[in-house]
Regions:
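Bacterial N-terminal signal peptides that target proteins for export
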Residues: 2-13
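Extracellular calcium-associated, cysteine-rich motifs in secreted modular proteins
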Residues: 212, 219-220, 227-273
Length: 349
């Protein structure tokens, strides 16, 4: 593994381990943060907690019996029986060829615990925290969109810039935030990201993978087709985990929306407006005479960066996936950049 790739994975793993997230201009969130041990009942999932076992205390087995779950640890078995625990599984599923480094980071010690939803989350947190083998217990906060259902397009200016442009994509003339010469109405020259100068150095490389942790990407979009995908799976064998990451046929990424499947979700990406917009900003094909330009969309011939979809939202504002699992998935997929334009107000301690 390249050292840059390894450092990127470690960075994302540490972010996942500490369970932190930053807020962005497109926030999704919940109620104000609550004191530790007293999660808001409006934002914390009922009947579910996230625990981290101490080193060497992870259950060797979890067996379902008529009387409940059995782990081989008497104190733990008594506690989960008292709570009415119905399911317990790793937060981060077995990672195939990445399992060794997953364990080195201690991510294999995080477990989700499902219990009787009528029981108090606060009481369950305290009961599990008292167990000798438990390092910490956290609520699982719900993530909900607080913005509009759909983006509202701002009126386009009547005039567009007329100066020569680096690529022939028709929408580039209106992407003033890339390079602003002040010629458009109400424009301020230089209020941009200076992208045209950056393109003189590089317009992106298909050796670079960007994980888009957001709504699903429309991988068949005419300005994105060919720039979204996991090549090992795309050209691999159907029904086989060709890249050895623990996920089968994740050709375009993975849909992490909650389900009973394990690993959570499925390989069926559901296109979402915001996720597709974000992917286009990153990797829309440059120089194809279609749509807009991507910041790292290359110089034609799919020479720009590749993106993979780590889907955690749908157009249904009540659907959401597990963000920290999505982050790790992207890192294991070789992403050196994880794009996240979302956030929440409650954070993990």
């Amino acid at each position: 593994m390249h050292s840059f790739e390894k450092k990127s994975w470690l960075h994302i793993a540490l972010c996942a381990l500490s369970l932190l997230a930053a807020c962005a201009s497109d926030p999704i969130g919940e109620e104000a943060p609550q004191p530790v041990g007293e999660p808001s009942q409006e934002t914390a999932a009922t009947g579910r907690l996230r625990v981290k076992f101490k080193q060497g205390e992870v259950p060797e087995r979890i067996i379902e019996t008529r009387s409940g779950l059995q782990t081989g640890s008497e104190p733990l078995d008594r506690a989960i029986a008292a709570l009415g625990v119905t399911r317990m599984q790793r937060v981060f599923p077995p990672a195939g060829r990445f399992e060794a480094r997953t364990r080195r980071a201690g991510l294999d010690r995080w477990y989700d615990v499902w219990f009787d939803s009528l029981r108090s989350v606060t009481r369950a947190t305290l009961d599990l925290s008292r167990l000798e083998g438990i390092e910490c217990v956290e609520p699982v906060y719900a993530i909900r969109s607080i913005g509009p259902e759909r983006a509202v397009a701002a009126p386009l200016p009547a005039a567009t810039r007329t100066a020569s442009l680096p690529f022939d994509d028709p929408g580039l003339a209106k992407q003033w935030h890339y390079s602003n010469d002040g010629s458009m109405p109400d424009a301020v020259a230089g209020a941009d990201i200076n992208l045209f100068r950056a393109w003189e150095v590089t317009a992106g490389s298909n050796d670079v993978v960007v994980a888009v942790v957001d709504g699903g990407i429309d991988y068949a979009h005419e300005d994105l087709v060919g720039n979204v995908g996991n090549w090992a799976e795309l050209y691999g064998e159907e029904g086989v985990d060709d890249d050895g990451n623990g996920y089968v046929d994740d050709i375009y990424g993975w849909n992490f929306i909650y389900s009973s499947a394990y690993p959570m979700g499925s390989n069926r990406i559901t296109p979402v407006e915001h996720g597709t917009h974000v992917a286009g900003t990153i990797a829309a094909e440059n120089g194809n005479g279609i749509g807009v330009c991507g910041v790292a969309g290359g110089r034609g011939g799919h020479s720009g960066v590749r993106v993979i979809s780590c889907q955690m939202f749908t157009e249904n504002r009540n659907d959401n996936g597990d963000e920290i699992v999505a982050l790790k998935y992207g890192a294991d997929a070789g992403a050196v950049i994880s794009q996240n334009s979302w956030g929440y107000t409650n954070v993990y301690e």
